[in-house]
């Protein structure tokens, strides 16, 4: 009979693999002390029963935004006060209703049950603020909220209506331009402070990896050249620390598979191929269903080739928006799902582009009529394999 002993006794280059997880928050966040101090200075008044400024935090994926905010939340919660920070991932809580319900459930447990309307939940928010409570609502990937203008207006209006207490918004976004899509009323009501997280340099990534190697690997288990290579490869891409950590973790797993007691450059090179597919799969598998069907349609057409490929002005690999929508409708019928309207389809494309899964561009003058051209952001074979497995496994 198989038991766990052989796995527990197995030699490994790892000492504590969880240290390499993107969810792990180290005691010290290198190269983010300045941003952490700045954010803390803006929200400190909340701990003295004063409303703090709204904050928008920008930066590419893997620049330490979420990790820094969670570190701040740890420190915030150590101080006894009427203030609380509420963290929400807007890929999950992607509407005004979901955001308000999630925040208010912490004060009014009965809201856990379905069936409460938005006006009732809003009244509970006002009641909470009137109890001299101070809230900071952290909206990670704030761009993913469908009715963001309504949400911002509602949250800022609550301050005026309650008369006491205070609610502040802390938005986190990968897109510096996301505010351009807000209506003037929302922009005006925010009155926010903006903080930017720059991508890590090669040298900074080296130091971050060295810190995690010390905590997560056995002594002398990772060659310095492997750390340097992982940092250099990551800096070439986009300075994403999460990518660098995943690269190192995969390299360690490969070394274990080979029964080696150290990680070298060859393991990092092999890990690079696996990690790229892993990251694409993670992003795709967390997509809402209709987004995933849209992406599946694009991948399928990309493999089969556009029927308009021979048109003048049609760049290689690009598809016309209309043919993608037709394929999306076919995929929906095949899956026995009701296709959404063109308006919703365009929203899906915008979201997929924001995640780097597709590239869109207006058509050139050589193509009759004005349309949007669409291209996958990754290899069609990889994307199709992931989406096809998701729907037809």
Please place each PLM-identified region on the residue numbering.
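A short, basic N-terminal segment
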Residues: 1-52, 75
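P-loop NTPase Walker A phosphate-binding motif
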Residues: 58-83
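Conserved C-terminal helix/linker of AAA+ ATPases
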Residues: 254-280
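Short alpha-helical segments that sit at the start of domains
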Residues: 277-315
């Amino acid at each position: 009979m198989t038991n766990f002993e052989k796995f527990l006794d197995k030699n490994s280059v790892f000492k504590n693999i969880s240290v390499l997880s993107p969810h792990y928050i180290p005691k010290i966040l290198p190269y983010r002390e300045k941003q952490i101090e700045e954010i803390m200075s803006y929200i400190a008044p909340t701990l003295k029963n004063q409303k703090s400024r709204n904050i928008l935090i920008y930066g590419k994926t893997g620049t330490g935004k979420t990790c820094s905010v969670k570190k701040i939340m740890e420190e915030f919660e150590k101080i006894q006060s009427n203030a609380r920070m509420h963290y929400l991932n807007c890929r999950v809580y992607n509407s005004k209703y979901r955001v308000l319900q999630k925040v208010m459930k912490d004060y009014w447990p009965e809201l856990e049950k379905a069936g409460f309307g938005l006006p009732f939940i809003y009244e509970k928010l006002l009641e909470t603020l009137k109890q001299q409570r101070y809230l900071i609502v952290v909206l990670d990937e704030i761009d993913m909220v469908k009715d963001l203008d309504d949400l911002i207006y509602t949250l800022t209006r609550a301050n005026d209506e309650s008369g006491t207490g205070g609610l502040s918004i802390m938005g986190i976004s990968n897109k510096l331009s996301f505010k351009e899509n807000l209506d003037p009323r929302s922009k005006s009501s925010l009155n926010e402070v903006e903080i930017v997280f720059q991508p890590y340099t090669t040298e900074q990534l080296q130091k971050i990896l060295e810190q995690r190697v010390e905590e997560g690997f056995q002594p002398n288990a990772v060659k310095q050249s492997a750390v340097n290579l992982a940092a250099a490869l990551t800096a070439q891409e986009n300075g994403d620390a999460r990518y660098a950590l995943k690269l190192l973790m995969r390299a360690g797993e490969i070394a274990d598979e080979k029964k080696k007691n150290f990680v070298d450059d060859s393991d990092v090179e092999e890990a690079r191929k696996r990690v790229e597919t892993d990251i694409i799969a993670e992003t795709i598998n967390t997509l809402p269903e209709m987004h995933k069907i849209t992406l599946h349609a694009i991948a399928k057409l990309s493999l089969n080739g556009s029927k308009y490929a021979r048109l003048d002005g049609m760049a290689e690999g690009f598809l016309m928006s209309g043919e993608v929508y037709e394929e999306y409708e076919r995929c929906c019928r095949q899956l026995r799902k009701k296709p959404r309207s063109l308006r919703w389809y365009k929203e899906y494309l915008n979201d997929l582009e924001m995640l780097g899964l597709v590239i869109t561009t207006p058509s050139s003058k050589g193509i009759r009529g004005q349309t949007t051209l669409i291209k996958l952001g990754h290899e069609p074979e990889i994307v199709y394999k992931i989406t096809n497995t998701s729907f037809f496994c």
